[in-house]
Design a protein with these regions (language model features):
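Bacterial N-terminal signal peptides that target proteins for export
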Residues: 2-13
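Sec/Tat signal peptide C-region and signal peptidase I cleavage site
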Residues: 24-28
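Histidine-centered active-site loop/cap adjacent to the catalytic His
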Residues: 266-366
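Alpha-helical cap/lid subdomain in secreted, periplasmic
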Residues: 110-303
Length: 366
């Protein structure tokens, strides 16, 4: 390793210290976590590529800067595609944990566009607004005195700016992709936010409930994400509905909660926000206890109350010195995937999101 490489590694390690919470002022708390894994199906040599761009969610972050969960949402989708197409699937994740939407757009989607330009690419997916929201939430929660909502509006505006730009770039570069998807945001820490802010609202003179403040912003981001998808030839994976709503009808309105919460094409932003924050508010559930039935729940969030849980213990190296790669057989056989669902599809956060992506997969690769 030459001197330049050593210096680069030191800078990367400093960034890692911030990412894991060790004090290192003036260093950005982001780290690239790139991986490539080929799902090697027996009896075929045909290989197609899935490319995923995003932050720690698509990375499969699991509390380590050295490795990520193998079965993150894009990998799960890749396994479904391998079954559907009877082919090998290379799952390429170009992700940056801690990154804002602008960073993901500029340095991952545009800066690393060559990965989706490969002629073997058949599916591209991205997510990008989570850290804008998390950082704005943290900033607001730390305020005292008069509440300043500007940080929340900035996060909303940045997501509104970079989401369609990301779609336009993917449309330009991923010319062989059969399907393009974007995931909207689930709400991590929903229950934890159900408390009073430290600051005082200038209009009411009262300390606002943090959940009441944040939920409308999440709803606006999600409506805009799905609306931009419809305008740019993308499919919107409604992770908010799938994670935050029970998989049965809890309020007796005749609809399964996770279905009733979905984005509806043609619905106005104002109507969607009202439906999420008021009409169906009572059906929202913290993802730490996602109800698949009235008596059965599964934890979709890790102990950090932010990142999705994942099936199995397998990991892929990533982080400081570049990405990790590997290959292996599918985890689930064709016989285990029934009606497009593996046996774990609704028991872990990443399994649920990966299944959500797979709902839009075409029947054939060409």
């Amino acid at each position: 390793m030459n001197l330049s490489s050593i210096r680069g590694a030191v800078r990367a390690f400093a960034a890692v210290l911030v990412t894991v919470g060790v004090s290192a002022p003036a260093v950005a708390s982001t780290i690239n976590q790139n991986t490539s894994w080929t799902i090697d199906r027996s009896g075929t040599t045909t290989k197609y590529r899935v490319v995923a761009y995003g932050d720690s969610i698509y990375a499969g972050y699991r509390g380590s800067v050295f490795n990520v969960a193998k079965r993150s949402a894009p990998w799960v989708d890749g396994e479904y595609l391998s079954t559907k197409w009877a082919s090998d699937i290379e799952v390429v994740r170009r992700t940056k944990s801690g990154a804002l939407a602008s960073d993901i757009y500029n340095n991952k989607i545009v800066g690393e566009r060559s990965y989706m330009q490969a002629t073997s690419t058949r599916a591209v997916s991205f997510e990008m607004c989570g850290n804008d929201g998390l950082q704005a939430r943290s900033s607001f929660a730390g305020q005292s005195g008069t509440c300043n909502y500007a940080v929340l509006n900035t996060a909303l505006n940045n997501c509104t700016t970079y989401t369609p730009l990301a779609m336009q770039a993917i449309n330009q570069y991923a010319t062989t992709a059969r399907v393009k998807t974007v995931s909207n945001l689930y709400y991590p820490g929903y229950n934890a936010d159900n408390g009073l802010a430290k600051c005082t609202d200038s209009a009411t003179g009262q300390r606002p409930n943090r959940q009441n403040v944040f939920l409308p912003y999440v709803a606006r981001i999600n409506w805009r994400t799905c609306n931009f998808a419809s305008q740019n030839g993308f499919q919107c994976v409604d992770s908010f509905a799938q994670w935050m709503g029970a998989d049965y009808d809890s309020n007796g309105d005749g609809q399964v909660d996770s279905v009733a919460l979905r984005y509806q094409q043609g619905e106005s932003e104002a109507a969607y926000v009202t439906r999420i924050t008021t009409t169906l508010r009572s059906t929202l559930r913290d993802s730490n206890a996602h109800l698949v039935s009235a008596g059965t729940s599964y934890d979709y969030l890790q102990s950090d109350d932010t990142h999705g849980t994942y099936y199995g213990s397998a990991t892929i190296s990533s982080g400081l010195f570049g990405g990790g790669s590997g290959s292996g057989a599918p985890d689930f056989s064709n016989a285990q995937i029934v009606n497009g669902q593996n046996p774990q599809w609704n028991r872990f956060g990443h399994e649920r999101m990966g299944h959500g992506i797979s709902l839009f997969d075409p029947a054939t690769p060409n």
